[in-house]
């Protein structure tokens, strides 16, 4: 499981608020947070870069720990 929700909560933001920053619908962010959908590498990088710009100090590995994808495949 990824740590998007944990990072979002640390910022004190709702899913709706963070989704707006990305220009996404709240449901897309929810799907990523719950693991219903897996973000591609580009989306993962965008998420981490944005979290850092918003004041979090995180890395790709801290938000998306290695082995996060249940089937073991890297998404792109």
Regions of interest found by a model, annotated:
Residues 12-31:
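Short alpha-helical DNA-recognition segment
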Residues 3, 28-31, 47, 62:
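Residue-level recognition of specific faces of alpha-helices
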Residues 33, 43, 51:
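DNA major-groove recognition helix of helix-turn-helix
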Residues 37, 41, 49, 56-76:
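Short, charged recognition helix plus adjacent turn
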Residues 5, 9, 23, 34-36:
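Residue-level detection of the helix-turn-helix DNA-binding "recognition helix"
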Residues 3, 14, 40-43:
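Residues that mark the N-terminal boundary/hinge immediately upstream of a DNA-recognition element
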Residues 1-10, 58:
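A short, Lys/Arg-rich alpha-helix, primarily the initiator
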């Amino acid at each position: 499981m990824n740590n998007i929700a944990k990072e979002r909560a640390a910022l004190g933001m709702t899913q709706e608020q963070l989704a707006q920053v990305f220009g996404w619908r709240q449901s897309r962010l929810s799907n990523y947070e719950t693991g219903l959908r897996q973000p591609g590498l580009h989306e993962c990088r965008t998420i981490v870069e944005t979290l850092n710009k918003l004041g979090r100090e995180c890395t790709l590995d801290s938000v998306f720990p290695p082995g996060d994808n249940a089937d073991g495949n890297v998404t792109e």
